[in-house]
Structure formats: C-alpha cells, structure tokens
From Swiss-Prot:
Protein's name in the database: Small ribosomal subunit protein uS14
Cofactor entry: Zn(2+)
GO biological process: translation
SUPFAM superfamilies: Glucocorticoid receptor-like (DNA-binding domain)
Species for this entry: Elusimicrobium minutum (strain Pei191)
Cofactor details (free text): Binds 1 zinc ion per subunit.
Annotated function: Binds 16S rRNA, required for the assembly of 30S particles and may also be responsible for determining the conformation of the 16S rRNA at the A site.
Record keyword rRNA-binding present: yes
Amino-acid positions noted as binding Zn(2+) in the UniProt annotation, renumbered to this chain: C24, C27, C40, C43
Intrachain S-S bonds: none
Length: 61
C-alpha cells in the first residue's frame, strides 16, 4: 500500500528535481533498479525467463 501511495505522490509535479527516485515500472520497487530496462532485478529476471524482453538471453560459459 505504501508503494501505491508513493507512486501517486510522485505523479504530481515536484518542486525540486532531486526528489525523483527511480522505481520499477511493474511493481514499484525502489531498489535493484536497472535504468536500461526501467525494471527492478526481480521483474527483469522474471520477464527475461518468460522471453518478454527482446535481446536478453540467459548467459552460459
């Protein structure tokens, strides 16, 4: 519930640009954020395994 409140609060125009914090577009998680994808590490892994992110493959060496 706190995540939804935070997302709603951030939707309003902010007085200062410094207050903006990157959050996952799917679940709203603030930590483990990948800027290239706009997702947190958990959602990125889940979506990559499902094949929803083009060009991302599981590495093996």
């Amino acid at each position: 519930m706190a995540t939804k409140a935070w997302v709603a609060k951030m939707a309003k125009p902010q007085k200062f640009a410094v207050r903006y914090h990157n959050r996952c577009q799917v679940c709203g998680r603030p930590r483990g954020y990948y800027r290239d994808f706009g997702l947190c590490r958990i959602c990125l892994r889940k979506m990559a395994h499902q094949g929803l992110i083009p060009g991302v493959r599981k590495s093996s060496w």
